[in-house]
Structures are given as structure tokens and as C-alpha cells.
Regions:
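Membrane-embedded alpha-helical bundles of multi-pass transporters/translocases
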Residues: 1-513
Length: 513
């Protein structure tokens, strides 16, 4: 048991380190984009153009299939060996690539109608902006086709307990998009010391071409991993193959779940935001980006590392070990996310100022990010709760939970956006996802008693929040002879250190995950 949990800890640390690198590169990319385009109609168009391509990836090869695929691949690897596992992988990958190609072609043909339709992507945009969305979306579909394969490669490598290259792939994607931002988009070259970088002057189109380049690098970096684990491609598609049917059985409900999540994260927010102030869609994108930094470092890293192991535990019918694994993960996530969400909200304005938005834009992003942070713990807990069901190859319960979440979010987003604008959409997101996480954990605890037994974790976390918040408030109120951004980072770091003594038991648990 201890060796298994240590393996999960190592994997989580690897994933967290490379997610941190990816987020650093992503932050740099978004910083440069903000300085180039601001909260502009062009950038709103680019963000809106990602919607349908992202949905195809999420439904077919990304969130829908990858999470459902790993438990089945782990079972095949455990019981039938690696060659049989890769045979199944090839059959599913061939099917997914074909389905993605067909859907991408259909969307490219009808892109103009999908953008301008009242229930479409951006009905609130004017005709020139809608035309720009159409062009950019067609370019992004090329990247989607590449991601249809690379998303499955991640599942194949993680089923083999290999996490390094899938984690590094995120950063390679950011390298490609950075090239788009720094070289392809600008009208004049960036100056780095004595070197002037070339500039292709593509404007917002440069970001789309950078996305395609990033998708190429995302796939290429993982090829050595396939070779290491003796991957052999099988040029076959067989829907009657028992493994393919097993994957599709789990994938069907998972597609519904991811579709509801897409509605909540992208379609409904952007549809509503396109009718609000210019820049609202981009404010949502930046607010979400800020919340996603700690969420992916904590929730995604732990959840991704945990899934192959808890899938093995279910295969071996180790219910007690499964329950303990999840309980430890939940306690660690609460101990880290609750204090961090509060402290990050307190230092938000100096952090957002570095993007260079005007006063109105800065306020939009600050309060949108703060609203998203209310759901940081909920989003992170959901990373664990959902994977606990997929480890059992149960995709029905998360489907119904996400459907309920979508309805709840829709009502709250419409109401809150009328009261407080784009911030209300982010607040609705936080409350809806937190409610979904609580529901799934409640149902899990009924099946696995003791799973949500938190002991003294919450009282100690509450004390940590109070102590750290007071300390950060004191530091921010001082007139330090430093730039506001540096003062905010120092306050955040000191506040984080103040949290450590209160959550030390959970930090020790993290090393045993």
C-alpha cells in the first residue's frame, strides 16, 4: 500500500511541476496578448472562435474519452498485457480520429451559420466580428484534429504509469502558442537585448496559427513515450470489439457529462457575455485562467495521478484502500485550496494590473477572478470525485450530477448577470460546480463509508485562513517601497507560509498519497 501511494505522490509532483511550467508559459502568453490586444473585439472573437473546436476535443478525445479510457486501458494492461492493450488503443484511436475529421469538416462548412445563429456562438457580435470568429474557428479546427490523437496518447501513457511526457506536452503547446504571439502576430519585432525577433504581422490570425503549431508540438513530444512502451499501430476499426464496446459504454454518459460542462464553462457564459460590455468574454477568460492556476496545480495534478491507481484498486476489489486513497486526497485538497483562494483574492488587483488593461477592464477581471475563486475548492474536489466514479467505470452518476449542475448554473447565470454583469456569470460557475462536487461526494460516501471523514481538517483550515488573511492584510496596508505587484507576491508568499503549521498533518498525508 505504501509503495503504491508513494508512486501516486511522485506522479502528482511531476504533474504539478510541469503544470506549473505550463501555467508560467501560459501566463507569459496571456500577458503579451493582453498588452497587444487589450479587452478588444478582436480578442473576444479569438476566444469565441475556440468554443466549438474545444468542444469537439473535449467530447471525443479529451475530457470525455481520456478519463473513461484510462480505467479500461489499466484493466487490459493488468489482465491481458501490453500488446493487447495497445491493440485496443489503436482501434479506439482510429475511430476517434475519423469521427473528429467528419465533425470538423461539418463545422467548417457551416461555421458562418453556427456563429451568427441566435443560439450559436456569438449572436451578440456585429457582422464583421462574426466573420472574424468564423475564419479563426476554421483554423482552430486543424489543431482539434491533431488533439484528437494526442489526447488519447496521454491516456495510453498514463495507463502505463508514465506521466512525464504528457505533463511536458502542455508546455510544448504553450511554446507553439507563444511563437504565434511573439513572432506571427506582431506588426513589429520584439526586441530581446541586441536581437530583434522577426514579425509576420498576422495580427489576431497569428494566435490561431500559433495554436496549430502548439498542437503539432503537443503530439510530437509524446512520440518517444509510445516507442518506449512498444506501441504498435493497428490499422483497424471494429465497433464489435469487446474492448471498444467497453470504452464506448463508459464514454457515452461521459460525453453527456462533458457536454454539460461545456455549456457551463463556454457556451452559456459566452452567449450571455456577448450581450454585455465589450471585453466581457475576455474578462471571463482571464478570470478563469487565474482560478485555473491553483486548481490545476492542486486538483488536476492529484486527480490525474490518482486515477490509474484507484482504477487498479477497484479492479483488485480493494475497497478499503480505495476509500483511504480518496479520503487522503480530499483532505489535502481542502487544506490547500481554501486558504489559497482567500489569499489570492486579497492580492488580486496588483496581480491583474500587470496585464495592462484600462481601469474598467482591470475591475472586470479582478472581480470576475474573485468570483471564480469562490469555487476553487469545489472545482478541485470535483477532479477527485468524478474520477472516483470513472475508476468504477460508472459514468451515469456524474452525468446526472452535471445535468443538474448545468440547469442550476443557467438559472443563476441569467439572474446574476442582470444584477452584477459578467461577475455574476463567474459566481454562478463557482456555486454550481461546488454543489456538484458536494453531491457526488455525498453519494460516494454512502457507498464507501468513511470516505468524507475529515477529522480536524476543516477547523484547522478555518484558523489558517483567519491567521493568514490578517497577516496579508497587514502587509498590504504597509507602505512598502516596492512595486505593488512585488508587494502582493511577498504578501501571498508570507501568507502561504503562515498557513503551513495549521495544515501540517495534511501536508504529511500528501507525501503518502
Amino acid at each position: 500500500f505504501d509503495s503504491t501511494m508513494t508512486r501516486v505522490t511522485r506522479a502528482a509532483l511531476i504533474i504539478a511541476i510541469f503544470i506549473g511550467l505550463e501555467k508560467l508559459l501560459g501566463f507569459l502568453r496571456q500577458l503579451i496578448i493582453a498588452r497587444q490586444f487589450g479587452l478588444s473585439a478582436e480578442l473576444d472573437a479569438f476566444n469565441a472562435a475556440n468554443n466549438l473546436p474545444d468542444l469537439i476535443f473535449a467530447l471525443i478525445s479529451g475530457g470525455a474519452l481520456a478519463v473513461a479510457f484510462i480505467p479500461v486501458l489499466s484493466e487490459y494492461l493488468e489482465e491481458k498485457g501490453r500488446p493487447i492493450m495497445w491493440d485496443l488503443f489503436s482501434r479506439v484511436a482510429n475511430l476517434v480520429f475519423l469521427a473528429t475529421a467528419v465533425l470538423s469538416a461539418i463545422i467548417a462548412i457551416f461555421a458562418e451559420q453556427l456563429v451568427g445563429w441566435q443560439l450559436g456562438i456569438a449572436p451578440g457580435f456585429g457582422a464583421p466580428q462574426q466573420a472574424l470568429v468564423t475564419d479563426l474557428m476554421r483554423l482552430n479546427l486543424i489543431a482539434t484534429l491533431l488533439f484528437s490523437v494526442s489526447g488519447l496518447v496521454i491516456a495510453g501513457l498514463q495507463a502505463n504509469q508514465h506521466f512525464l511526457l504528457p505533463a511536458l506536452a502542455r508546455s510544448m503547446y504553450d511554446v507553439g502558442t507563444l511563437i504565434g504571439v511573439i513572432i506571427l502576430a506582431p506588426q513589429t519585432g520584439y526586441q530581446i537585448g541586441p536581437i530583434t525577433l522577426p514579425a509576420f504581422g498576422m495580427g489576431i490570425y497569428g494566435l490561431a496559427y500559433g495554436t496549430v503549431l502548439g498542437a503539432v508540438l503537443f503530439l510530437a513530444i509524446q512520440i518517444p513515450g509510445l516507442l518506449r512502451y512498444q506501441f504498435r499501430w493497428v490499422p483497424k476499426i471494429n465497433l464489435r470489439h469487446p474492448g471498444v464496446q467497453q470504452v464506448l459504454k463508459v464514454m457515452g454518459p461521459r460525453i453527456g457529462t462533458v457536454f454539460f460542462i461545456y455549456l457551463v464553462l463556454i457556451y452559456i457564459p459566452d452567449n450571455i457575455a456577448s450581450r454585455l460590455l465589450t471585453g466581457s468574454i475576455t474578462a471571463l477568460a482571464y478570470g478563469w485562467l487565474i482560478m485555473q492556476l491553483p486548481e490545476t496545480l492542486i486538483g488536476t495534478a492529484i486527480g490525474t495521478a490518482l486515477l490509474p491507481t484507484i482504477s487498479e484498486q477497484i479492479t483488485r476489489d480493494e475497497r478499503g484502500v480505495f476509500t483511504q486513497s480518496l479520503n487522503r486526497a480530499l483532505r489535502v485538497i481542502l487544506a490547500l485550496t481554501l486558504p489559497f483562494s482567500l489569499l489570492l483574492a486579497m492580492v488580486m488587483r496588483p496581480l491583474v494590473n500587470v496585464f495592462g488593461f484600462d481601469l474598467v477592464g482591470t475591475e472586470m477581471v479582478v472581480w470576475t477572478a474573485r468570483a471564480f475563486l469562490i469555487g476553487l475548492a469545489g472545482h478541485s474536489l470535483l477532479e477527485i470525485a468524478a474520477r472516483a466514479y470513472y475508476a468504477q467505470q460508472n459514468a451515469i452518476t456524474p452525468l446526472w450530477a452535471s445535468a443538474l449542475m448545468m440547469v442550476t448554473f443557467s438559472v443563476m447565470a441569467l439572474l446574476f448577470s442582470k444584477l452584477i454583469g459578467v461577475v455574476g456569470i463567474a459566481l454562478a460557475n463557482a456555486l454550481a460546480f461546488t454543489g456538484e462536487a458536494i453531491l457526488l461526494l455525498y453519494l460516494l460516501n454512502r457507498k464507501f463509508p468513511g470516505l468524507s471523514r475529515l477529522g480536524s481538517t476543516l477547523p484547522r483550515v478555518a484558523l489558517a485562513c483567519v491567521a493568514a488573511a490578517l497577516l496579508v492584510y497587514f502587509i498590504l496596508s504597509m507602505s512598502l517601497p516596492l512595486p505593488a505587484f512585488i508587494s502582493a507576491v511577498i504578501a501571498l508568499a508570507i501568507g502561504g507560509l503562515a498557513v503551513l503549521p495549521f495544515v501540517w498533518p495534511e501536508l504529511k498525508l500528501m507525501m503518502k498519497l
